[in-house]
Amino acid sequence: MTRVPRGYIARRRRAKMRSFASNFRGAHLRLNRMITQQVRRAFVSSHRDRVRQKRDFRRLWISRINAATRIHKVFDNYSKLIHNLYKKELILNRKILAQVAVLNSNNLYTISNKIKIIN
């Protein structure tokens, strides 16, 4: 049986994979089979970590808010602050609260005073 040269289609497919692997090193950049394996692995990792990133940032924001509320004695802890915010219908997301707690603690006092005044 004669050898069939696989025209431009296979080259185009491999070139596309190679463009994804442009920042890899060593054999991961040069060998086609290794390139496909590593690119597939990189895509799996990037998808997994995009999902995990949301979880990690939420945990970071919660721990920052909790630390700020305990240090500045705004409330006893994070859960009481969030409970009172929802009870008084002052909906602030955790990202904004964490930024306020870290960058400007005076505004955290004003938020807590709003909650206490509404009581």
Curated annotation (Swiss-Prot):
Function: Binds directly to 23S ribosomal RNA and is necessary for the in vitro assembly process of the 50S ribosomal subunit. It is not involved in the protein synthesizing functions of that subunit.
GO biological process: ribosomal large subunit assembly; translation
Xref: CDD domains: Ribosomal_L20 (cd07026)
The keyword Membrane is assigned to this record: no
Localization, UniProt: Plastid, Chloroplast
Official protein name in the record: Large ribosomal subunit protein bL20c
Any one GO molecular function term: structural constituent of ribosome
Similarity comment: family membership: Belongs to the bacterial ribosomal protein bL20 family.
